[in-house]
Amino acid sequence: MIWCMIAALLLLAVFALSALIAEKCLQMVVNPVRYDVDYVKALETTNGFSDCIEAYETKWQRTPFVLHCAGTDISGEYMMNPADSGTPRKVAIICHGHTVNRYSDLKYADIFYRAGFSTVIFDERYFGESTGDFCTLGQNEARDVAAIIAYVRQIFGQDCVIGLHGESMGAATALLTLKYETPDFVIADCPFADSKLLFAQWLKRNLHIPIGLIWPILRRRAKRKYDYDVESVCPIAAVQGKNVPICLMHGKSDNLIPYTHSEMLRKACVNPNSELHLFENADHARSIVVARTEYERLVLAFLHNCGLYGTENKQ
């Protein structure tokens, strides 16, 4: 009898610990720290992108907008590029990563702007000036991007060329948007391929426990509290069968999302213009930091291969 009681207590302790870890993991995703504009500006300046911030704040023609998406206000801006006067117009929508805001988009928006694209930057739900009580790593965010695409078509014309660029969570969001829209291209910088795999790798690396201990609890809590289906946040499933050129960028020293996620995604791409580029000595979301010139060259080469950029367009 005593051994049965001990076994029951041990099982109860394991369940309680699993529930605690599941809740902590869920909260890291849905209610992470939110860095303000001053923090992100300082970070981007330290990383060498003060020129992009200056161009945005002093040179670009900025038009703010707010879109109402499923009870959430998405705050953003579009920058009409005087060089983007042809037909059709060309627009790049930039999606930032977890914990930051639209100022993190500027280093990427600058590449497109100088290449003759008009650009759109925005705060993902829960971050920056957008509203929202929680984040879903791309589930709801992809629908927001689909709404932004519809808005962009109203502003720039139904026939406009639309591309997506995303970093980290923003990259996953851009890829998940393929469930709802067919952009002309996607550039995904350090995305995850599958959220369950990402959780499993994080747990093994940091807590040395298997995903099976917490996944059922985490899934139930996410669905019950946030209507968040964590298992459906699977960019690789969204990519499969979609004839959209996708350029994947990833640091080989990424300690948050291993570059193998981008390798998996590349294998799922069907468009012949899809590419994968790995950057030596680049940690998470730092490929453009460690190799800015090469990063820009690869972006422009990809756009050229897609028929969207040529030397005659460069400013």
Label for each model-derived stretch:
Residues 282-293:
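Catalytic histidine-centered segment of alpha/beta-hydrolase-like enzymes
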Residues 156-168:
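Alpha/beta-hydrolase fold nucleophile elbow
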Residues 135-156:
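Alpha/beta-hydrolase active-site loop
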Residues 176-228, 237:
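Hydrolase active-site cap/lid region
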Residues 3-67:
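An N-terminal hydrophobic leader/cap segment in hydrolases
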Residues 109-131:
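Conserved alpha/beta-hydrolase
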Residues 241-243, 248-250, 254:
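Short beta-strand/loop motif that positions the catalytic acidic residue
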Residues 255-261:
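Conserved alpha/beta-hydrolase "acid-adjacent" motif
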